[in-house]
Amino acid sequence: MTDAVRSAYRERAGEYTEALGSLSAMAEGDRNLIAGWARDVDGPTIDAGCGPGHWTKFLHDHGVAVEGIDMVSEFIDGAAARFPEVPFRVATLEALPADDAALAGILSWYSLIHTPPADVPALLTEFARCIRSEGTLLLGFFEAGQIEAFGHAVVTAYYWPVPLMQDELAAAGFEIVETHTRVDPGQRPHAAIIARRRSWIR
C-alpha cells in the first residue's frame, strides 16, 4: 500500500499543493487546535507525513523546533523550495528519523488515512518509540461509526471511529488528553486526538 500511496501522490503533488498546500485552505478550527498544541510542545518535533509543508511552516512560525518528513519526494522538494528556513527530508512513517524518546511531539495530520487499518497499530507504536515521556501526539483523521474504506480523491482512505482510535493509541503507549470532532456542511466528519506518551519507566 505504501508504494501505491507514494505513486498516487507523486502524480498529483503539484495539483494537491495548489489546492490544499496553504493555510488559507485549512479550517480555522484546525489552525486554532494545532496552534494551541504547539504552545505546549517544548523540544524537537516531527510533522509526520507533512505533504506540501504548510503545517510544518505553521509550527515553525509558532516557535516549534520542527522537521517535516514525507515519503513523496515531490512534496519535500516543493516544501523546501517554498519554506527554505524549515528543515524537510524524505522519510517514511514506518521508520521515523528519530532516536528512542528523542521527540517532544509528533503532528500526524491526516497522514494515517491511507494506511490499511491492520497496519495502523505498528505506526502508532513507531510514534510512541520516538516520543519522550510526557511528549504528545496530535493525530487528525476522518471519523465514522466504523472502520470503513472510502474513495479519497487521490487513493483509497479509511474512516476510523474515535473510540477505536483511542484504544489503538492506548495500546501503543499513549494516554488520551483531548478529543475533538467536527462536521462541516458537505464534508466528511473530522476528528483529532491529542495523546500523551506514558512514562517510559514503569
Predicted feature residues:
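Acceptor-substrate binding/catalytic loop of class I
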Residues: 148-164
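A short acidic, Gly/Pro-enriched loop at the edge of an enzyme's catalytic core
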Residues: 94-106
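Class I SAM-dependent methyltransferase SAM/SAH-binding core
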Residues: 46, 52-95
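Conserved beta-strand signature within the Rossmann-like core of class I S-adenosyl-L-methionine
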Residues: 134-141
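Core SAM-dependent methyltransferase catalytic element
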Residues: 182-202
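Conserved class I S-adenosyl-L-methionine
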Residues: 1-41, 145
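A short glycine-rich, Lys/Arg-flanked "PGG" loop and its adjoining helix->strand segment in the class I
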Residues: 121-133
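A short SAM/SAH-binding and catalytic strip from SAM-dependent methyltransferases
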Residues: 104-118
